[in-house]
C-alpha cells in the first residue's frame, strides 16, 4: 500500500544542494527524496533548520576584508 506524507519541495542550484546533502549526512532525517539536480523533497519541519545551517555555511565562506583589518 502506498504511503503519502506531506513534504516541502526545495528548489536550489547544485552547489546549495551539495550543502544541504552535507547538512543531512549526519542524521539522514532531513531529505526524504532527491528528485533531480535542483529539487529535493524534505521534511517540512526541518526547513527552518536548513535555512539556519545554510546561512551559517554561507557566512563562513564569505570574504570580509574588514574582519581581516580587525585581526592582523
Swiss-Prot record:
Component of the general transcription and DNA repair factor IIH (TFIIH) core complex, which is involved in general and transcription-coupled nucleotide excision repair (NER) of damaged DNA and, when complexed to TFIIK, in RNA transcription by RNA polymerase II. In NER, TFIIH acts by opening DNA around the lesion to allow the excision of the damaged oligonucleotide and its replacement by a new DNA fragment. In transcription, TFIIH has an essential role in transcription initiation. The keyword RNA-binding does not apply. Component of the 7-subunit TFIIH core complex composed of XPB/SSL2, XPD/RAD3, SSL1, TFB1, TFB2, TFB4 and TFB5, which is active in NER. The core complex associates with the 3-subunit CTD-kinase module TFIIK composed of CCL1, KIN28 and TFB3 to form the 10-subunit holoenzyme (holo-TFIIH) active in transcription. One of its GO terms (biological process) is transcription by RNA polymerase II. The gene is TFB5. It comes from the Eukaryota. Belongs to the TFB5 family. It holds the Pfam family Tfb5. The keyword Glycoprotein does not apply. Keywords: DNA damage, DNA repair, Nucleus, Transcription, Transcription regulation. It is found in: Nucleus. One of its GO terms (cellular component) is transcription factor TFIIH holo complex. This is General transcription and DNA repair factor IIH subunit TFB5.
